[in-house]
């Protein structure tokens, strides 16, 4: 009963872990060629996915940058908390890839070299080259037909096939990759195989008779992992093909061990944890430790708040719901769609064209559209200042020409000189008889960010 319970428990654990069975080592050139590809594929997908996700995040980050200039004041405020989180996500991924790239490149290089060696070994092994001497007309070797085959050391053109599962049926994944050792050295020796037939009878060897007419002397090369040398027995039975030498060869050296170490090292440098995050995902953005602070500053209006001064619930949740939907459920529609619908400007060498941020595909286009947006803002600001300056100068001229009894209707005497009434002062003087500080407050309000004014009023 106890034994049955243990067996059942082991079976249950195996099912829950979902662990792939450990597999036996490869034993053939093409089997090892396939096994290496399966091993590195376990991590290659994570690395390539990290690069692709970083590329996509950077593209979307460019849209955020463009929106900070081209967007409405409300959109700019909505973007502000996302900007910081998105930048940190991209930075962390780039840091991870800085470590990961050399690791995957080194592993890919070693695996490619080792697979190439297994492929070459397979071509050598299947070369089937021979040197055949067939004595025919007399006991002399003096015609081409007496050398019917002379391609000793031939290399087969066909190496290992593209289908990995044909030479190696094993399944390799993250549950068993750690148990994989270095692929074996399938070829460690090269042998000369020989056969000598003294006449037309296949069983008549050359060890007990002279090679003569219709005799055959044949040599070939074979490759394996054995040190077999049957020279001694062959000399007593030369009519039978045997390996008469065993020369040690090592095509691989330490490369199999180095490749195995490099592949397993990809686990520790895997960029997936840092690079699987997407900046268009609300939860990813909101997980940033400074997200609530930026919401407090940009969306609630407490611009002087710093760490530890973040707004609390329900104020914080209310702001998030207003701009991103309840717990970010409208993050895509209310932020990203708004960003992508925002007008942008590009030139076509002759005139400026209006497009949308979603159409900006490259960093160059983002840069141009943002620059053109800045130019428009600078031009608008300059125009506003020029208009204000003109109005001030006009008022100065109108009041300056008036006599003392005419100095009214927006003008006042200052030390005997008629000058324009400063904004707010006249009204305050009428109400209180003294100069109020409203003018100073008005200046502060004018200088506050437009988006803050939008939120507060």
UniProtKB/Swiss-Prot annotation:
* Cellular component terms per the entry's GO annotation: plasma membrane; side of membrane
Where do we find GPI-anchor amidated serine lipid attachment? 440
Q: Which SUPFAM superfamilies match?
A: Variant surface glycoprotein (N-terminal domain) (SSF58087), Variant surface glycoprotein MITAT 1.2, VSG 221, C-terminal domain (SSF118251)
Taxonomically, the superkingdom here is: Eukaryota
Residues of the propeptide: 441-457
Asked if Ion transport is a keyword of the record, the answer is: no
Q: What keywords tag this UniProt record?
A: Cell membrane, Glycoprotein, GPI-anchor, Lipoprotein, Membrane, Signal, Trypanosomiasis
Q: Does the keyword Cell cycle apply?
A: no
Q: Which residues are glycosylated?
A: 436
From the Swiss-Prot or TrEMBL record, give the protein name.
Variant surface glycoprotein 20
Q: Which organism is it from?
A: Trypanosoma equiperdum
Lineage runs: Eukaryota, Discoba, Euglenozoa, Kinetoplastea, Metakinetoplastina
